[in-house]
Amino acid sequence: MSQLCPCGSAVEYSLCCQRYLSGNQLAPDPVQLMRSRYSAFVMKDADYLIKTWHSSCGVAQLRDDIIAGFAHTEWLGLTVFDHALTTDGKTGYVSFVARYSERGRAGAIIERSRFIKENGQWYYIDGTRPQFGRNDPCPCGSGKKFKKCCGQ
């Protein structure tokens, strides 16, 4: 029986993010890197997360913290709701909602991630957390107000 990819693509894992996590292929664009990094969180693959974080972020020394974070977090879903590339094609942005449960408490990360391309490979560099009003539509696309959805 095949397993769907945790990134939410509705494609089998073996045909989707597994090729990136295994190192057989590089993610071709920021959206695929975002999806594969989410899958790495679900699959508890600290090596892939560190490998795809830009070296200037100095996350290699945070390996133990990353692994410790896996123990109490269950990832529930990813929604990518916007993405863009700069005109030179060397910087990309991906806006997403990642839902999770930590120690039984629901949460969501809403971020506009920045990725850079160096030597043909995309890397996560940082992200910003956009602010939403409680009565704004939720960016996840549910049609609900933010306060009744990801803003809880």
Swiss-Prot record:
**UniProt xrefs under HAMAP family:** UPF0225
Q: Which cysteines are joined by disulfide bonds?
A: none
Q: SUPFAM superfamilies from the xrefs?
A: NTF2-like, Sec-C motif
Instruction: Check the record and name the PANTHER family matching this protein.
Output: ADENYLATE CYCLASE-ASSOCIATED CAP C-TERMINAL DOMAIN-CONTAINING PROTEIN, UPF0225 PROTEIN SCO1677
Organism annotation: Escherichia fergusonii (strain ATCC 35469 / DSM 13698 / CCUG 18766 / IAM 14443 / JCM 21226 / LMG 7866 / NBRC 102419 / NCTC 12128 / CDC 0568-73)
- Listed Pfam families: SEC-C (PF02810), YchJ_M-like (PF17775)
Protein's UniProt name: UPF0225 protein YchJ
**Its domain of life?**
Bacteria
The UniProt entry, under NCBIfam families, shows: PRK01617.1, PRK01752.1
Write out the transmembrane intervals. Answer: none
Q: Which family does it belong to?
A: Belongs to the UPF0225 family.
